[in-house]
């Protein structure tokens, strides 16, 4: 029997995201990894480095999500306010994590660019589970309060992804209500609307597994997705639908689970082997 379904909101913090100076890959990565463990992402929110607006976003998330995940704003500068604002919103004090402080001393002891404000990073919500940062200095964390599960991850994409996969996903895996498997059939020479017309009747009645066409920059894909208690069961559900899609689309199919025509051609050349 599957577990309770948890709704998640991702709050990405950073004025640079709103200005378009940085692409929000963190939200994409978090969503992708959560989908693999059956945790539903319902909302993406982006907010600048403003404590009042961030507090409003957290209050909104508290009213509609079971899991709140923030990315960004954990660094040592004056505009890194995610921990302070989030902890205040849940009435949790920030306390020094001595293990992280010791680790930070070790990390920066030979640095010429050390400043005392670096140690603000080791102030964390009391009683939280600490996520060590293997790619930087700002730790993340998770805590539970008022029936909500709160995770805070760093903003730099490399740091966020490493912490997400090594710490956050293992922490959240217990909450997933099943396993999700998704595969794509890549096609060239036929448009999204034509593919939709071919499969319209089937897609209207399919729920699990499901399929949907998507237009990409130079081609299209048909995404087939299934959810089950185990990955093996989900794979079994997806397999016949994938075969059906490939059979119906025939000569338009150039690959499965590839990113582009170029990648498919390269794989073909390597398999020959040819250059």
Where are these regions (language model features)?
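Short amphipathic alpha-helices in soluble, non-transmembrane regions
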Residues: 236-247
């Amino acid at each position: 029997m599957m577990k309770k379904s948890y709704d998640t909101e991702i709050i990405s913090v950073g004025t640079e995201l709103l200005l378009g100076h940085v692409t929000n890959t963190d939200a994409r990565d978090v969503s992708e990894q959560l989908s693999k463990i059956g945790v539903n992402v319902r909302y993406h929110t982006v907010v600048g480095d403003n404590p009042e607006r961030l507090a409003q976003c957290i209050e909104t998330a508290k009213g509609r999500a079971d899991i709140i995940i923030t990315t960004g704003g954990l660094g040592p500068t004056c505009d890194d306010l995610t921990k302070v604002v989030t902890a205040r919103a849940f009435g949790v004090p920030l306390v020094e994590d001595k293990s992280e402080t010791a680790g930070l001393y070790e990390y920066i002891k030979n640095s010429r660019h050390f400043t005392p404000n670096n140690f603000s990073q080791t102030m964390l919500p009391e009683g939280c589970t600490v996520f060590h940062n293997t790619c930087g200095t700002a730790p993340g964390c998770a805590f539970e309060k008022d029936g909500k599960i709160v995770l805070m991850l760093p903003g730099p994409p490399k740091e966020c992804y490493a912490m997400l996969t090594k710490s956050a996903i293992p922490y959240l895996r217990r909450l997933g209500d099943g396993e999700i498997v998704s595969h794509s059939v890549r096609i060239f020479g036929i448009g999204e609307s034509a593919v939709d017309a071919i499969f319209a009747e089937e897609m209207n009645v399919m729920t699990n597994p499901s399929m949907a066409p998507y237009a990409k920059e130079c081609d299209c894909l048909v995404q087939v997705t299934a959810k089950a208690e185990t990955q093996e069961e989900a794979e079994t559900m997806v397999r016949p639908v994938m075969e059906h899609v490939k059979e119906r689309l025939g000569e338009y199919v150039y690959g499965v689970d590839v990113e582009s025509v170029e990648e498919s051609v390269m794989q073909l050349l390597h398999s020959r082997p040819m250059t």
